[in-house]
Amino acid sequence: MNEARAETGGPNRTPRSEIRPAVSANRKKEPVLLLDLSTSMNWGAADEYDPEWPDAGSRRAIVIEALHGLVRVLEQEDSEAAGDQASGDDERGGLMTHGFGNRYVEIGDLNSSNLERRLNEIKWGGKTYIMPAWKAALADYDEEFGDRDPDEQPTMLTLVVTDGEADDWMEFEPVLEKATAKRVFVVAIVGHGRKHDATLVAYQQAARKNAARDKFGKVHVEVVSFDAVTDPEEIALDLITLVS
């Protein structure tokens, strides 16, 4: 294997050789991030004895650093973000982000200018209720693109970054099962251990059910495990491959 593409992490880490773009390059897409803010995101990424947030080895710190790498690439593709930041406005343009924990948190556009500040201003902690964030993301997309002809609407590419199965999984699983070529999901799972592995299995099963519904057997839910990965650059590069 090419050493530059070698992966680190635990036994369930998705091989990097299997990671590919979720949406083909010739299709227009609108990426959106659903970010897990639950308490366990403060825990260590690779071991239960690892130091917690604000240590650089915590899941939260690693994810924030990885998102820096992702948004830098995405804003090169986003003329609005580039224009807004050139004019000194870092509030607009970037990766539209919705947080989920005990409740929905509207985070807004994340870009390289505001990411650190925005993610440190919000309240982290609690359980893992994802549906309110998904509904908000869908409403945002419909507001921006709903009046366009269906052929002119970009693919809604939803990146879910999480470390655990949703507390409202029974509601979210059918959303994944019904994913389409116009509504694609990438699920990136960080953390380690039994909780990570159970989460991975649940999302993989939803992805298989989704593929079974497609008459051509195509998969519209990509599930990637970052089992015990502690290198944010490695995660960023894989997210860039999946989303950009």
Predicted regions and their residues:
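…and closely analogous acidic/polar surface helices at protein-protein or active-site interfaces
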Residues: 28-29, 40-92
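Short beta-strand-loop
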Residues: 79-122, 197-205
